[in-house]
């Protein structure tokens, strides 16, 4: 085949991708934005469903379920954390066995089932907003079973849908690679549109009509999302696994760690073969090999059929190890991020929420400000700031993903500082008007005081969360793209669990509701301001640690065709 004809085929067909019939995917009729918008639509519906439950969950727990503020906040953080850690399992199933498409369909069925049971449990529990008596153990068990069934559905849905969407763009094609970077921006914008709709519509229904209806509407939206996803099948590109490999990527990479550990004490005199090392490794001697590179060696006394690990597998394993320090530092962002669905909402309950005579804003609805700031800023970032940055840095994305993440971490620190100052003002207002021991009395302080912290958190999300999605997707081996997004989600999940643990320990140390707890159920006697200052320090320390680590990070190389 001539070079010209080979180039023509590469332009017409996508390497390592097939269409719905299993044939090589044609660039002109599959993938890119025609397929991506189907998948983005699915995510809008899923986020509508998720936030239709989660955004006002603390109000349901402290209302109809009769839990204290500290216990409810811990339960929300625990559910949120587990929901974003379980995708590691879903990604494993998708990347090792079922593939993204089938995993999404199965996970969606589980998701719908969980929402249906959740609706049933809310229908059976009295629709109280004030605590009178706790529901029966059976109804409590049904509610939490349903809630965690939804989390299991999310485990397969969340990492695979976004990875499947990004798969519609060929990273080896310069134009499609640039479009893929835009995809992550528009994905997040559209996702926030679904979140905003849920916060405005579903939360209002939950607060003013019925919790059962408020949980039932998300269930209907998830059914719609599943139908929409299947309708777009003919336009999708499906990733091919490496044909020469008989084992799944987890087995190959796991073998690298096993062999490397076994070969740690080997030196050059013990070797009978070294797997050929590509590119910049070709000049390395055995003594210079790092821990994982020892997997490229075979000892003299090995069995006849024993072979060294392939250099590609070692590179894949090394890429995963490099992500660990970055992942750890992003936890400093994830812990403050967990607060907007819990304590931000509880602050709003105590404040003046009337916008028109007889019309009050549900406290959880203020979360829509995060979505609004994202919807407003993403187009500016994608269409204005990225081209400006591209002209200066020559980077197709404007700035590197790590710089984008770091910018968001700075904004998150600022968010916590502002939140602490606003909470101090709220406590001063309660003291000034003699309302410290009247927690159910509305303070003469507008809920719009919370506006800056919500908007700042939205700007931080545009940088850090979108940056993390693109970073972890692009830096893992091609066959593990679902895992890459699950790694990003797990950081947010572990952050939520750490937040829950931190709340528990601080509540224990400061005496609970009987003492001067920072999280006293009477927020006028609590000290959320102290907690926010603590989180500001955690976030700042995390940022400087991230800055140190990111300077030495080596990005994964992509071969462009």
From Swiss-Prot:
Any one GO MF annotation of this record: tripeptide transmembrane transporter activity
Residues carrying Phosphothreonine: 103
Keyword check for DNA damage: no
CDD domains: MFS_NPF5
Record's GO cellular component terms: membrane
Lineage top rank: taxon: Eukaryota
Transmembrane region(s): 78-98, 104-124, 133-153, 183-203, 211-231, 324-344, 361-381, 405-425, 447-467, 486-506, 530-550
InterPro entries: MFS_trans_sf (IPR036259), NRT1/PTR (IPR044739), POT_fam (IPR000109), PTR2_symporter_CS (IPR018456)
Membrane topology designation: Multi-pass membrane protein
UniProtKB keywords: Membrane, Phosphoprotein, Transmembrane, Transmembrane helix, Transport
Pfam families from the UniProt entry: PTR2
PROSITE patterns, per database record: PTR2_1
Tissues expressing this chain: Expressed in roots, flowers and siliques. Detected in stems and leaves.
Location in the cell: Membrane
Cleaved signal peptide residues: none
Family: Belongs to the major facilitator superfamily. Proton-dependent oligopeptide transporter (POT/PTR) (TC 2.A.17) family.
Protein name as annotated: Protein NRT1/ PTR FAMILY 5.13
Lineage of the organism: Eukaryota, Viridiplantae, Streptophyta, Embryophyta, Tracheophyta
Gene name tied to this protein: NPF5.13
């Amino acid at each position: 085949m001539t070079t010209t004809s080979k180039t023509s085929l590469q332009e017409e067909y996508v390497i390592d991708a097939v269409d719905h019939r299993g044939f090589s995917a044609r660039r002109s009729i599959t993938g890119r934005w025609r397929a991506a918008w189907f998948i983005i639509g699915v995510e809008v519906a899923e986020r509508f469903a998720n936030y239709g439950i989660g955004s006002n969950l603390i109000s349901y727990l402290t209302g109809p379920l009769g839990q204290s503020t500290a216990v409810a906040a811990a339960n929300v953080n625990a559910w949120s954390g587990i929901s974003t850690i379980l995708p590691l399992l879903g990604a494993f199933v998708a990347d090792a066995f079922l593939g993204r498409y089938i995993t999404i369909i199965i996970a969606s069925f589980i998701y719908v089932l969980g929402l249906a049971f959740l609706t049933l449990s809310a229908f059976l529990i009295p629709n109280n907003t004030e605590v009178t008596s706790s529901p029966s153990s059976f109804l409590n068990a049904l509610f939490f079973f349903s809630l965690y069934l939804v989390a299991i559905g999310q485990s397969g849905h969340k990492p695979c849908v976004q990875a499947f969407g990004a798969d519609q763009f060929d990273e080896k094609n310069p134009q499609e690679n640039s479009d893929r970077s835009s995809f992550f921006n528009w994905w997040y914008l559209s996702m926030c549109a679904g979140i905003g709709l849920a916060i405005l519509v579903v939360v209002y229904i939950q607060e003013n009509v019925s919790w059962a209806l408020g949980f039932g509407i998300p269930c209907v939206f998830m059914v719609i999302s599943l139908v929409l996803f299947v309708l777009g099948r003919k336009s999708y590109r499906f990733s091919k696994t490496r044909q020469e490999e008989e084992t799944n990527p987890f087995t190959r990479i796991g073998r690298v760690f096993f062999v490397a550990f076994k070969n740690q004490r080997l030196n050059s005199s013990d070797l009978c073969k070294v797997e050929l090392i590509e590119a910049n490794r070709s000049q390395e001697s055995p003594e210079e090999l790092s821990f994982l590179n020892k997997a490229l060696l075979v000892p003299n006394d090995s069995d006849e059929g024993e072979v060294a690990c392939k250099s590609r597998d070692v590179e894949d394993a090394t890429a995963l190890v490099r992500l660990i320090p970055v992942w750890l530092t992003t936890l400093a962002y994830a812990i403050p991020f967990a607060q907007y669905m819990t304590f931000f909402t509880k602050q709003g309950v105590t404040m003046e929420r009337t916008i028109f005579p007889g019309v009050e804003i549900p406290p959880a609805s203020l979360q829509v400000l995060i979505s609004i700031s994202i919807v407003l800023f993403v187009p500016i970032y994608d269409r204005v700031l990225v081209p400006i940055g591209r002209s200066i840095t020559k980077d197709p994305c404007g700035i590197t993903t790590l710089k984008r993440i770091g910018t968001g971490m700075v904004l998150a620190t600022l968010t916590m500082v502002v939140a602490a100052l606003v909470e101090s003002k709220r406590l001063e207002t309660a003291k000034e008007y003699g309302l410290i021991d009247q927690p159910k009395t509305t303070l003469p302080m507008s809920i719009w005081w919370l506006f800056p912290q919500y908007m700042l958190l939205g700007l931080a999300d545009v940088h850090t969360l979108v940056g993390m999605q693109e970073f972890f997707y692009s830096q893992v081996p091609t066959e593990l793209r679902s895992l890459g997004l699950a790694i990003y989600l797990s950081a947010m999940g572990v952050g939520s669990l750490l937040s829950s643990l931190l709340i528990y320990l601080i509540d224990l140390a400061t005496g609970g509701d009987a003492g001067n707890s920072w999280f006293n159920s009477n927020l006028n006697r609590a000290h959320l301001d102290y907690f926010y200052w603590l989180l500001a320090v955690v976030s700042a320390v995390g940022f400087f640690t991230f800055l140190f680590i990111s300077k030495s990070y080596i990005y994964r190389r992509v071969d462009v065709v």
